[in-house]
């Protein structure tokens, strides 16, 4: 069996083979393009496969390595070493019919805030979840980021598009740019990313209807939170009496205090 260092596609999916095989359990997919398409990014397409999500990667190995995207080495390491609660990482690898690395498998997360659920009884907006759910998510995300540090993985490229909102509030997706690292600053940087993640969750609510000047102030606040070791503790304290209240109310209160 050849490895990923054989060439895969160039910069499009035009020449990608349809048939794929799961590396661990040898499940065979005759035509991945026949599966429901549920997501896209600059580096791949995501398809629904039962309770799993399959990411078909774009580009050949040289470009993916150069741009620090997902590689066979990284995906294999994630599969072997991670068991996360809120960050969706690879759980298996996809090979094409020639045994060449072509993508990876994740748990599929139902994003109740996506267009798919608009107008349905179970649709949610990010701010409709409760402060208690935020606190629960914060605890489990903290465990996940600590696990990343213990395994030598640096979280990268977390942005608004990284968030999914299932019934238990929030999960992070798109770990393609996460890096294997031995940097002495790894733990500190991951904790900054953790605090940044929680601040962004509130920012997405606080920024609704804000002027450019107010958004600039909110951006400054997010940066402050990322560098404030006590931010998570302060946030937990803020939640206190409004445990069952929607996150949007907490965010609205914070925005009024910050922007007045």
What do these predicted ranges mean?
Residues 145-166:
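Catalytic-loop of the protein kinase fold
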Residues 166-259:
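C-lobe/activation-segment region of protein kinase-like
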Residues 85-137:
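Conserved structural core of kinase catalytic domains
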Residues 52, 104, 171-174:
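Protein kinase-like catalytic core scaffold
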Residues 3-63, 68, 85-86:
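ATP-binding glycine-rich phosphate-binding loop
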Residues 131-149:
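Conserved alphaE helix
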Residues 48, 108, 164-165:
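Conserved hydrophobic "DFG−1" position in protein kinase catalytic cores
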Residues 15, 58-98, 128, 132:
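A conserved alpha-helical element in kinase catalytic cores
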């Amino acid at each position: 069996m050849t490895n990923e260092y054989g060439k895969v596609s160039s910069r499009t999916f035009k020449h990608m083979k349809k048939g794929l095989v799961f590396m661990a359990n040898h499940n065979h997919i005759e035509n991945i393009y026949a599966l429901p398409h549920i997501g896209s990014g600059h580096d791949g397409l995501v398809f629904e496969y039962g309770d799993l999500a399959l990411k078909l990667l774009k580009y050949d190995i040289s470009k993916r390595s150069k741009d620090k995207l997902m590689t066979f080495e990284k995906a294999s390491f994630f599969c072997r070493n991670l068991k996360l609660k809120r960050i969706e990482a690879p759980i298996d690898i996809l090979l094409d019919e020639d045994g060449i690395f072509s993508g990876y498998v994740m748990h599929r997360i139902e994003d109740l805030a996506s267009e798919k659920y608009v107008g349905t009884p179970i649709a949610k907006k990010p701010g409709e979840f409760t402060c208690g759910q935020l606190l629960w998510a914060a605890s489990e995300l903290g465990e996940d980021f600590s696990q990343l540090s213990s395994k030598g993985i640096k979280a990268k490229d977390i942005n608004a598009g990284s968030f999914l909102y299932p019934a238990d509030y929030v999960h992070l997706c798109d770990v393609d740019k996460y890096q294997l690292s031995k940097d002495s600053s790894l733990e500190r940087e991951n904790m900054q990313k953790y605090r940044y993640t929680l601040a962004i969750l509130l920012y997405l609510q606080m920024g609704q209807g804000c002027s450019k000047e107010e958004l600039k102030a909110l951006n400054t606040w997010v940066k402050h939170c990322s560098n404030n070791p006590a931010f998570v503790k302060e946030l937990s304290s803020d939640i206190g009496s409004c445990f069952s209240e929607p996150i949007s109310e907490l965010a609205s209160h914070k925005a009024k205090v910050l922007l007045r």
